[in-house]
Structures are given as C-alpha cells and as structure tokens.
Curated annotation (Swiss-Prot):
Transmembrane segments: none
A Pfam family: Toxin_8
Expression sites by tissue: Expressed by the venom duct.
Propeptide intervals in chain numbering: 22-48
Protein name according to UniProt: Alpha-conotoxin-like Qc1.2
Annotated localization: Secreted
GO MF entry, a single one: toxin activity
Keywords for the protein's UniProt record, in alphabetical order: Acetylcholine receptor inhibiting toxin, Disulfide bond, Ion channel impairing toxin, Neurotoxin, Postsynaptic neurotoxin, Pyrrolidone carboxylic acid, Secreted, Signal, Toxin
Domain text: The cysteine framework is I (CC-C-C). Alpha4/4 pattern.
InterPro entries listed in its UniProt record: Conotoxin_a-typ
C-alpha cells in the first residue's frame, strides 16, 4: 500500500471518528427530539404513576 493510499485511509478514519464523536456528543448533551421519546422514559413515567396509586403500589412496587 503506497503512502498516498495510507494517508487517504488515515483521513477517512479521522473523518469518520469525528463525525461519530460529534453525533454521540450531540445526542447526550441535552434533550433533543430523538431523545425525548425514548421507551425507557415512558416506562419510568408509568412506574412512577403506578407507585403513586396505593393498590398498584402494593402489588407492583417494592
């Protein structure tokens, strides 16, 4: 593999790493549209509502 090809591969890897890092950082920085409706948020909300209800709390919450 020639030097030019190795340099090109290096640049592609650096670009891919930068793009992946940027998108992961953006998703974890705040509450963007994709992160607002995660299933885990809905499950946590359902558990909180259930545990506020005494009959449900007695059966399902620990």
């Amino acid at each position: 593999m020639g030097m030019r090809m190795m340099f090109t591969v290096f640049l592609l890897v650096a670009l891919a790493t930068t793009v992946a890092s940027f998108t992961l950082d953006r998703a974890s920085n705040g509450r963007n549209a994709a992160a607002d409706d995660k299933p885990s948020d809905w499950i946590a909300l359902a558990i909180k509502q259930c545990c506020a209800n005494p009959p449900c709390k007695h059966v399902n919450c620990r």
